[in-house]
């Protein structure tokens, strides 16, 4: 049930009018200065208003009923951003959550950030754009050169091919890359095509690939990868089945290019599978925390995930093979609690500064 009426604002003498909305027996009072929520507590709670601009597909996978219900109980209100109205005319928002593409939208967000510095934008458009090009995506990991007592984290050797497929075999030879090679589209825009992979077993077949693309040396990893979800300071790791290992015999016998769909997301979870313990063991928590903290700073992002593999036959040699902004959190266990806690911490931190 929804009610609208004018009431006096008890939180701030400056306020005169506010909108009262009753949803599922939870009273939400909204105005420009003092949004509050009263869910039967002795004192009202301040509402954290999250404006969201997401694709239809993302809304369906992310804004699930359980998330919205939990958010409402915690005093978080999700509000859809109207793309037909100026963003500055909407809100007020405490947080803007987005995953849309296009230069026009990026400019809208940049202008909004400049005119509304009090609003947390998740995440800065320029920082997100950095991950859309696989030529630069993994550079932050390579620059870290992370190595400590818990393990070593690197990236596979790779080569960027922007044009001229016929020249690929020669370029691969000059770069000294070792077969087999994984071919990925250069642009990582979240489309189905951007997640397609090809595995090339011999040099001659390389000229059948379609630039622009990135070639990465394939690292045997027991057919399992680790998806490391990062939400602010929180980290959650799940196992996924991946491409199977390639033996020397297979490399000598197989030819051509094998194409795969989106491997890690299409595959079933490997968490409950009967796996070799040396393959299934999760990366050390301290190593992941160090990696995530450093990447949050280097990338300027708070919502992303890493695809990590362990080199087969080793216990502590890891490779980051992909980074995705605002991934499919709906596949992350307990994402509703983790995400709402994160949004709440951002909102509370904002009000404490006032």
Curated annotation (Swiss-Prot):
Q: In which tissues is it expressed?
A: Seed specific.
Q: Which SUPFAM superfamilies match?
A: Glutathione synthetase ATP-binding domain-like
Co-factor: note: Binds 2 magnesium ions per subunit.
Q: In its keyword annotation, does this UniProt entry include Metal-binding?
A: yes
Binding-site residues for 1D-myo-inositol 6-phosphate, renumbered to this chain: 57, 99, 190, 195, 227, 229, 305, 324, 328, 331
Query: Which Gene Ontology terms cover its molecular function?
Result: ATP binding; inositol-1,3,4-trisphosphate 5-kinase activity; inositol-1,3,4-trisphosphate 6-kinase activity; inositol-3,4,5,6-tetrakisphosphate 1-kinase activity; inositol-3,4,6-trisphosphate 1-kinase activity; magnesium ion binding
Domain ATP-grasp: start-end pairs: 144-352
Statement: the UniProt record of this protein carries the keyword Kinase: yes
Task performed by this protein: Kinase that can phosphorylate various inositol polyphosphate such as Ins(3,4,5,6)P4, Ins(3,4,6)P3 and Ins(1,3,4)P3. May participate in an inositol lipid-independent pathway of InsP6 synthesis.
How it assembles, according to the record, is: Monomer.
Which family is annotated? Answer: Belongs to the ITPK1 family.
The protein here is known as: Inositol-tetrakisphosphate 1-kinase 3
Query: What species does this protein belong to?
Result: Glycine max (Soybean)
């Amino acid at each position: 049930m929804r009610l609208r009426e004018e009431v006096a604002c008890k939180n701030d003498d400056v306020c005169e009018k506010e909108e009262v909305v009753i949803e599922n027996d939870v009273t939400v009072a909204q105005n420009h200065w003092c949004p509050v929520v009263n869910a039967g507590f002795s004192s009202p709670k301040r509402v954290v208003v999250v404006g969201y601009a997401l694709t239809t597909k993302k809304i369906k996978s992310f804004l699930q009923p359980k998330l919205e219900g939990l958010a409402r109980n915690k005093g978080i209100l999700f509000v859809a951003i109207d793309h037909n109205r100026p963003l500055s005319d909407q809100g007020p928002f405490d947080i803007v959550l987005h995953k849309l593409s296009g230069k026009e939208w990026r400019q809208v967000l940049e202008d909004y950030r400049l005119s509304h510095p009090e609003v947390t934008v998740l995440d800065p458009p320029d920082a997100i754009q950095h991950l859309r090009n696989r030529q630069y995506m993994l550079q932050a990991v390579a620059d870290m050169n992370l190595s400590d007592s818990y393990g070593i984290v690197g990236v596979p050797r790779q080569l960027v091919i922007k044009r001229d497929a016929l020249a690929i075999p020669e370029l691969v030879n000059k770069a000294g890359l070792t077969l087999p090679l994984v071919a990925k589209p250069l642009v990582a825009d979240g489309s189905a095509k951007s997640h397609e992979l090809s595995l090339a077993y011999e040099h001659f077949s390389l000229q059948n690939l379609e630039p622009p693309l990135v070639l990465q040396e394939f690292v045997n990893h027991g057919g399992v990868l680790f998806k490391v979800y990062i939400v602010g300071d929180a980290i959650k790791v799940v196992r996924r089945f991946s491409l199977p290992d390639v033996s020397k015999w297979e490399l000598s016998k197989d030819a051509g290019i094998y194409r795969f769909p989106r491997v890690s997301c299409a595959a079933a979870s490997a968490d409950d599978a009967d796996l070799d313990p040396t393959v299934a063991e999760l990366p050390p928590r301290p190593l992941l925390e160090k990696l995530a903290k450093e990447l949050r700073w280097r990338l300027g992002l708070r919502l992303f995930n890493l695809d990590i593999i362990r080199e087969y036959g080793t216990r502590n040699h890891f490779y980051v093979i992909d980074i995705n902004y605002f991934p499919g959190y709906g596949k992350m266990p307990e994402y509703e609690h983790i995400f709402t806690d994160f949004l709440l911490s951002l909102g509370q931190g904002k009000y404490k500064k006032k």
